[in-house]
Structure formats: structure tokens, C-alpha cells
A protein has these predicted regions:
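Juxta-kinase regulatory segment immediately upstream of eukaryotic protein kinase catalytic domains
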Residues: 1-25, 229, 236-239, 243
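ATP-binding glycine-rich loop module of kinase domains
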Residues: 22-73
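Activation segment
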Residues: 41-42, 110, 160, 167-171
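Conserved structural core of kinase catalytic domains
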Residues: 47, 55-59, 68-86, 90-128
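Conserved hydrophobic alpha-helix
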Residues: 85, 134-137
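Catalytic-loop of the protein kinase fold
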Residues: 139-149
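Conserved protein-kinase catalytic-loop segment immediately C-terminal to the catalytic Asp
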Residues: 148-155, 161
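C-lobe/activation-segment region of protein kinase-like
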Residues: 155, 165-262
């Protein structure tokens, strides 16, 4: 339990009134690096209505949006998710202080898995690291929120950490759907990088080996979610923009795996 008189709580109370952005990094008087997430504006409901419409017409159940009510509800959700995940052995930031208007938590590391996959020579090893870390979370009976590679930290001690828990998918979908959603977030954010680096075929082999360790239901849900997007795998020109090309690379990865090993 976080006590009101602990030094982190005092620091949070001092920081919140002067922090201009929703999320910011701070160095405390002790030299410790922390992050503060401040309550911000609610996200317009039309975003969820629009995204939900596309998810519905394509039957993308595992990709359907999770309501984010913004403001204090986000703070409460994030604090709760951090505590639950940490209690189940998932490497997430430790909650140091909380109030209705914000939370303070620890800094896991400087480099995201996205940066590592983009710039390191052994990008496939890093990619596999993300797959294994997501599976470990599920083996603990837990799920993540949006495990895009930018939200996965390559920690200095060699472990893998997760950040960004402002949504709780488990309130709106089954555990199996949460598992599928976690993988889809990760694959969608990384397949295009591996394709650009000429490593998509190798990634297909790794992904197939990984699917052999997963529940058949999860694998089926992932394939079903991507099936309506398979036509996009022929999109290559930059004029399509980053988001469509990410989906195109995801579709190509899943298609190649299914075609090669079905």
C-alpha cells in the first residue's frame, strides 16, 4: 500500500501542478529517474465508434478497440494494471505513488525493443525476445494492453519489460482474445521492419515455431483476424502510408506462415 507521507507521494504532489504534459520523465533529488502520468483530457468517443465500425465489418474481434475513458479513469486503470501485473511476476514499472490526478512509477530502461529491432544486427533474436516475453505474460495468466514494440523495454539486465497500461482489454473481451490481441499488436508493429531488412522469411520460420507453443484457439484467432487483410499484402509503394504498410507486412507474414506450413 502506498502511504500518503512517503517521499514519492510528496514528490508526486509537487510535480503534478507544474507538469504541462500528460506523461513526463523526472529526476528526483535522490538522482532516481521516474515517470509521472498526469490525468489528461478524455479521448473523443467518435474515435472508438469509427474504429469499432471497421473492426466490426471486417470481423476483427481481436483488434476491436478497448474503451479508454480518459482523465482519472485512465490513471486508476494504469495503477491497477501495474500492481496486478507486478504481483503476477510480469516485469512492469513499479508504482511509487498515486493520487486521483496522477501516478509516479519507476523507469525500466532507455531502449525499446522497437529500437533494438530497427538498429541492431541480430534483429531476429530481439524479435524472438518479444515473442517469448509476451508468451511468458500469458503463462502467468495475464495479458497486456498495447504491446507494440515501442511499449516493450529491453532492460539493462537483459530482461524484457512492458509499459503503457492505460487500457484494460480484459474488461471487454475474453482472455483468449486478449492473448491474440497482444500478439497482433506486436506483429503489426514489427513485421514491416523485418521485411524492410530482408528478414521476413526468417521471421516466418520463427513465428511458425512459436505458434507450436500456443493454444490452437489463439493461433486460429490471429489467423482469423488477419484474413480480411490478406489482400493488402500486395501493397508495397510508400504512397500507401505507414499504417497500411504495417498491416500489409503483417498480412504477408501470416499468409506466408500459413501457406508454408499448412
Amino acid at each position: 500500500m502506498i502511504m500518503n507521507n512517503n517521499p514519492y507521494q510528496v514528490a508526486l504532489a509537487a510535480i503534478l501542478p507544474r507538469q504541462a504534459t500528460n506523461i513526463a520523465r523526472h529526476t528526483l533529488a535522490s538522482g532516481e529517474t521516474v515517470w509521472v502520468r498526469k490525468a489528461g483530457k478524455s479521448i473523443p468517443q467518435w474515435r472508438y465508434t469509427l474504429i469499432g465500425y471497421f473492426a466490426a465489418i471486417f470481423h476483427l474481434n481481436a483488434l476491436k478497440p478497448v474503451p479508454n475513458h480518459g482523465d482519472r479513469a485512465v490513471i486508476a486503470t494504469k495503477a491497477e494494471r501495474l500492481q496486478i501485473l507486478e504481483a503476477h511476476g510480469v516485469h512492469v514499472p513499479h508504482l511509487l505513488a498515486r493520487s486521483a490526478d496522477g501516478i509516479m512509477f519507476t523507469h525500466l530502461g532507455e531502449h525499446t525493443l522497437l529500437e533494438c529491432i530497427e538498429h541492431e544486427t541480430d534483429d531476429l533474436t530481439r524479435w524472438q525476445q518479444g515473442l517469448d516475453a509476451i508468451r511468458a505474460v500469458h503463462e502467468h495468466g495475464q495479458y497486456l494492453s498495447e504491446p507494440f514494440a515501442r511499449n516493450i523495454i529491453a532492460c539493462p539486465d537483459g530482461s524484457t519489460g512492458f509499459i503503457d497500461f492505460e487500457e484494460d482489454p480484459g474488461q471487454y473481451m475474453s482472455f483468449t482474445a486478449c492473448e491474440s490481441r497482444d500478439y497482433l499488436c506486436y506483429l503489426q508493429s514489427t513485421a514491416i521492419i523485418l521485411k524492410q531488412r530482408g528478414h521476413l522469411d526468417a521471421a516466418v520460420r520463427l513465428w511458425h515455431a512459436h505458434t507450436r507453443t500456443l493454444s490452437p484457439t489463439v493461433v486460429h484467432d490471429i489467423q482469423a483476424a488477419v484474413r480480411p487483410l490478406l489482400w493488402m499484402r500486395c501493397l508495397h509503394h510508400p504512397r500507401w502510408g505507414k499504417d497500411p504498410l504495417r498491416l500489409a507486412a503483417l498480412a504477408e507474414l501470416i499468409h506466408l506462415e500459413h501457406r508454408t506450413y499448412a
